[in-house]
Amino acid sequence: TLENLEWRISEVRRLMISQDMDIRICRFRQEQALLSILPFCKLDKKLFEASKRNMLTSSAASCYPFTSFEMSDENGILLGVNQHNNSLVIVDIFNSRVYKNANMVLLGTSGAGKTFTLQLIALRMRRKSTQVFIIAPLKGHEFLRACNNIGGEFISISPASKQCINVCEIRKQDLSANQLIDGVVNENSILAKKIQQLHIFFSLLIPDINHEERQLLDEALIRTYAKKGITHNNESLIDPDHPDRYREMPLLGDVYEILMESPETKRMGNILNRLVNGSAKTFNQHTNVQLDNLYTVLDISELTGELLPVGMFVALDYVWDKAKEDRTKEKAIFIDEAWELIGDDDTSNPNNAKALAGEWVQEIFKIIRGYGGAAVAATQDIGDLDRSRFGKGILNVAKTKIILNLEEDEARRVQSILHLSDAEIMSITRFERGQGLISTNSNHITVSFKASPLEKQLITTDRMELNQILQEKMAQNAHNADL
């Protein structure tokens, strides 16, 4: 009816005005207006002149729910397929001409596929000869199949493991490439730098350590290395009998013996005793693993309670030393469930162990670019990341973010951080496993992550798919037995 038509016109006019848009009725030019909006390329010149306006490209981009429909770097790794145009999404985060840094953050709720996506990226980086380190604080067994298949090194850090990383070891680094580039040799005390790192380790082990004990611990550490002939003179590190390597390094047991000599340091020695003579004495050994492999997984999932942040520190310390060797080589450090190490950001409390560790992790994210590397963190604790100074710092220095499925309240937090549109947030809350949004360089693209059948078999955590793999292997073993 005419009344109904007039009501609809009124509603459309009211809606446009609410959006700060002007609306005019094409009186006596309805036919030209209809032909102009149809895909006939017959835009009426008079209507165009009456309605045209200048617009910034940023304003024009806001008319679209996603600001980019293409992401295909020349030498990148394949992540998946663009959901909007089925083009391949290929990203080279190490291309410094395109990306300010190679850091990446994966966000998603439990079961969204963070571990699957993280391993998929890590495997494809490895196939491009990028050195990959993965630190797994939870469910480390999920990384074992892929690691074994690609010929990687799987290192288990736990009280029950025979493998050990000596936290007191000063590792000899291959700095030949850096010296050729810079033409200078670093004369800073290597021992002083190592002791500084050990202070973080003991702060994690003894959260209530006070200022006096810190000073006494510092003296004990210097004495421990002095007994092995190591001083602040870097030349003292060289083994006289084997000039191509360093001297034998002290163990935690050597530190323990010195701490137990004095009543003022005996309390620290008693706490350290668990790692020397107690159930976790596996930490009191010389390093018996190698990090030369291009794909290294450090599993600390069997560490619980106060040993978990200690184990993460040991793993990060070892990997970080290796990552700084050659600035010309690509390398990536993956930290799954990074919040386990970052913790609180209250640095005003000197006894806050997680604050010290969080500051250290944030520093890695900030400066790893200078060593040709990337730091990748995966977490589902988005609220804590948003509230924490360290969490915000990591988000700010990660140029690339991958957002998997999120609950609506978590998605709204991400929206305020990454300035996503309502359409993008709606997509995030409806993502199925294997789908995500990549945000980088102001581009936002929805992607279906694609894995080959072999990759899926190596990294899947789905119960039904694991059961299918089990049945296939049992059938294969039965067939081999019959032969």
Predicted regions: what they are:
Residues 429-460, 467-469:
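Charged, low-complexity C-terminal accessory regions
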Residues 383-386, 394:
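Conserved H-loop
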Residues 379:
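H-loop/switch region of ABC-family ATPase nucleotide-binding domains
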